[in-house]
Amino acid sequence: MAIESFDVAIIGGGPGGYVAAIRASQLGFKVACIEKRETLGGTCLNVGCIPSKALLESSELFLQASKHFENHGIIVSKPQIDVPAMIARKDKIVKGLGDGISSLFKKNKINRIAGLGKIIASNRIEVTDKTGSKSEIEAKFIIIATGSEPASLPCLPMDGEFVVSSAEALNFKSVPKDLVVVGA
């Protein structure tokens, strides 16, 4: 099987990676972007900045309706939180922005490769897809834009129920009675 060659290969499809891919393509380079997630946008779009801000906006509106509308002469009977609706709104925002990035990739003819990229030589990347199958590509230039992952504390490992990552916190089914945030 022949190894496909690119001018530029970017490992990571988050804000650094997808912007680099789009710009490189606009400058006339043949570009590949390797991303381990199903969707582009990285931590920021999928499980970080964007979804948390969407939920914060919903929470702020709830607070305004609960405590401050009366100051403006607006009477609202007791507001209630519908967590599934808030999560659905957050998911719709994330999907829309992710679809926008995918559209830009298509428009700019960027080869999107799903999998985990590993540099194995100065111009070669091994890609492992979600089934464990491996392939290789080569590129004159490689950009590493792998972003961030939540870190677990050795003394308090994440269990998905009582100790959760930011990704899991963005999908709570209800508002927790108590919550402690470690890190920022």
Which residue stretches match the model-derived regions?
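Glycine-rich flavin
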Residues: 2-6, 22-175
